[in-house]
Amino acid sequence: MSKLPVIAGRECVKALGRVGFAVRRQQGSHIVLRRGSPFAQVVVPDHRTLDRGTLRAILRHAGLSVDEFTKLL
């Protein structure tokens, strides 16, 4: 398994957009993204750098592996 990259929240949102996620809304520093089929909803904090555990949880909710995600960056 690859190491998780150190990225910002906005970079994560752009990468998830490439696999069909769309920004649903934003409240404060949290961006809610949603994909229709298969249904998935993730919340990405708009921070300068995402913690490894936070990024891993986002990927788990999105149904992506670390390798798949790094190819999207």
Where in this protein do the model-derived segments appear?
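Basic nucleic-acid-binding interfaces
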Residues: 1-73
